[in-house]
């Protein structure tokens, strides 16, 4: 019902919603759980449903808060693929993560926010330089206000 509610909010046709729901549910290995109530779902399943809800109306811009938390490794890999496809097709994704390696692998641009303040931003190469994003973060952490 949640996914139909989201699709209704964005005016997604019955045919499009069904096709998108089935395709995304298949990719995220949650197809058999779609008829269940959300309250019956595990945290990982709820996360997958939230991802499908974010994508069902095919937005150009997607905002995600820690989208990989609670996902099994296969679903996390598939979500990374979905995100990369979205960007290759002209979309953009803003997402938060505490796993810097994920940001390094997925992002073209990065912003580091600490205590609500933007402390570094730019292309991945310009922020990272010759080191890793983790090294940059640790250096910024060492130079506290």
Model-derived regions, located:
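ABC ATPase "signature
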Residues: 121-122
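A short, proline-enriched helix->beta-strand linker immediately N-terminal to the Walker B motif
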Residues: 56-60
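A short, surface-exposed alpha-helical micro-motif characterized by mixed small hydrophobic
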Residues: 103-105
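Helical segment within the ABC ATPase nucleotide-binding domain
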Residues: 76-89
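Conserved ABC ATPase signature
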Residues: 37-41
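Conserved ABC ATPase "signature" region
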Residues: 4-8, 15-33
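Catalytic Walker B motif of ABC-type/P-loop ATPase nucleotide-binding domains
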Residues: 62-65
